[in-house]
Amino acid sequence: MDNHAAVREFDEERATAAIRELLIAVGEDPDREGLLETPARVARAYKETFAGLHEDPTTVLEKTFSEGHEELVLVREIPIYSMCEHHLVPFFGVAHIGYIPGKSGKVTGLSKLARLADMLAKRPQVQERLTSQIADALVEKLDAQAVAVVIEAEHLCMAMRGIRKPGAVTTTSAVRGGFKNNAASRAEVFSLIRGH
């Protein structure tokens, strides 16, 4: 699984200095009252926003339960927030994550699916990769026989710059195993994701 892990730890001092330089580059005075603490605040915000770079997302799936369950597990409407790696502006929306456990019947806690999505979203990211990384982690760590992940998100890089289309929603999906190979199963899980 390609996790795009960080090559070094977050350097808050360097990030603060870089934000100060950015303010100067756009024509602002970083020493005016309203901006005095902005570089440090932005650096702290980025430290949190990109925290997933410094974590192995598959660790959240290490705790499993042998339930003998061989049917669909689906968590819908998981809020996600990430940063577009092309423009470093947010994209946000919801993830729907479903899987059918492998023959072992091994399942993970429902909150772990949300944690996985959150951890992978907390890095410079593209929606397509995020969707695939979530699906691949479930196959890798749970040995799931079928996985479906759908993300619906609004990208501020499309809303506030360039084409300027606020409200446009991008939908991506990643299917693995039985959902990829069986059209009826895939149609069923997508119907459940849509809430029908």
Curated annotation (Swiss-Prot):
Keywords: GTP-binding, Hydrolase, Metal-binding, Nucleotide-binding, One-carbon metabolism, Zinc. Transmembrane segments: none annotated. The keyword Manganese does not apply. Its EC number is 3.5.4.16. GO terms for cellular component: cytoplasm. One of its GO terms (molecular function) is GTP binding. It comes from the Bacteria. Zn(2+) binds at residues 84, 87, 157. HAMAP family: FolE. Toroid-shaped homodecamer, composed of two pentamers of five dimers. This is GTP cyclohydrolase 1. It comes from Corynebacterium glutamicum (strain R). The lineage of its organism: Bacteria, Bacillati, Actinomycetota, Actinomycetes, Mycobacteriales.
